[in-house]
Amino acid sequence: MALNVVILAAGKGTRMRSDLPKVLHPIAHKSMVQHVIDTAYQVGSDAIQLVYGYGADKLQARLGEQQLNWVLQAEQLGTGHAVAQASANIADDDTVLILYGDVPLIQASTLEALLAAREENGLAILTVNLPNPTGYGRIVREGGSVVGIIEQKDANTEQLAINEINTGIMAAPGKQLKAWLGQLSSDNAQGEYYLTDIVAMAHRDGVAITTAQPESAVEVEGANNRVQLAQLERAYQARAAEKLMLEGANLRDPARIDIRGDVTVGMDVMIDVNVVIEGKVTIGNNVTIGAGVILIDCDISDNAVIKPYSIIESAKVGVDASAGPFARLRPGAELKEDAHIGNFVEMKKAVLGKGSKAGHLAYIGDATIGSGVNIGAGTITCNYDGANKFQTIIEDNVFVGSDTQLVAPVTIGKGATLGAGSTITKDVAENELVITRVKQRHLTGWPRPVKLKK
């Protein structure tokens, strides 16, 4: 018996006021429908049917590389009609799990509970109790057993008082589901084919109907406009922040962190306010992350300190190393153990060796720097000639004076000293002192320029 997941993603989302299909609007830098697809994989789906309509080209451009069966719903005639478009891809012995591309916060654990609640060849529906159920289909029970779902527009006064609502998420047996879909009618207040009508059919046919509920109602909330999208974003971030704290991170203010990827943290991590984490980020033990830091696809080792307003992207920070404030590590940069870069230092495709430091105002690109090196303020590795990039190699224990330019390709030998203001165009041997600045001149009685009269 296979688990066949059907994801409904055909709507335009008019209230979003956007050319982008509704399900492609992002939560934490990932489209809503991608969140749902990822969750479907987590519960062990054997196949995923993506029912699409509006914006097919944009959907396929974003999702096309994944293992999905694309099912076109040319006309949006209701949820029942949408699922029916996937019937040809459903085997009789499949368990069919129906999800929604604009309900991104549904948890795998909730879906697992729903599947576990389903009896053999039975129908399981995910419900939730709301203090204000206005707008939702109500769960109709008789003697405690579910007998049907009535939509808001079709409900009578007594049914409108029910606060258990249908989330739309359900698990059904493939053979019966296909039969029920063929019996749907659009004879209702909205003139649509309601998927919810299959619940009454299941009751009629004597099929066992069971229910499950999510841990939190926010799991089943959708986004029809940008206000609701922002609310889901905040709910996602609150959940992500809670997870970090349970794993060992101290968040200065859990409401002021944005997590837009997969982050792993060690013990006793301190994260200040307004930090943004994107992509795959690993943070070791006893790490301190300052306010306003942006971490993207990077590894931060034990005891490292990232001072405020630094950006670390596709880079590595070693044990006891530090960066910032206002430092930038671009892709391919690495700080080795106990290395340090300070304010307004930028590194790209470069390694700063153990115990080496660049305190301020430097650009280090396409360079390999050994241990115990001092990079003075204003130092620049001139790595680009307008067509190609070249390497700078600085060996151990080199002292680079302030305002030095190293014109690559160039190698500086161990223990060398480069005088401040030098432009280095040739290799420097070990323990040499090199000074290339112009000889200082003294002109006595020099008349300073004065402003011309207008």
From Swiss-Prot:
Acetyl-CoA binds at residues 377, 383-384, 402, 420, 437. Pathway: Nucleotide-sugar biosynthesis; UDP-N-acetyl-alpha-D-glucosamine biosynthesis; N-acetyl-alpha-D-glucosamine 1-phosphate from alpha-D-glucosamine 6-phosphate (route II): step 2/2; Nucleotide-sugar biosynthesis; UDP-N-acetyl-alpha-D-glucosamine biosynthesis; UDP-N-acetyl-alpha-D-glucosamine from N-acetyl-alpha-D-glucosamine 1-phosphate: step 1/1; Bacterial outer membrane biogenesis; LPS lipid A biosynthesis. Keywords: Acyltransferase, Cell shape, Cell wall biogenesis/degradation, Cytoplasm, Magnesium, Metal-binding, Multifunctional enzyme, Nucleotidyltransferase, Peptidoglycan synthesis, Repeat, Transferase. Its cofactor is Mg(2+). It catalyses: alpha-D-glucosamine 1-phosphate + acetyl-CoA = N-acetyl-alpha-D-glucosamine 1-phosphate + CoA + H(+); N-acetyl-alpha-D-glucosamine 1-phosphate + UTP + H(+) = UDP-N-acetyl-alpha-D-glucosamine + diphosphate. GO terms for molecular function: glucosamine-1-phosphate N-acetyltransferase activity; magnesium ion binding; UDP-N-acetylglucosamine diphosphorylase activity. InterPro entries: Bifunctional_GlmU, GlmU-like, GlmU_C_LbH, Hexapep, Hexapep_transf_CS, MobA-like_NTP_Trfase, Nucleotide-diphossugar_trans, Trimer_LpxA-like_sf. Mg(2+) binds at residues 102, 224. One of its GO terms (cellular component) is membrane. Residues 1-226 are annotated as: Pyrophosphorylase. Its main location: cytoplasm. HAMAP family: GlmU. This is Bifunctional protein GlmU.
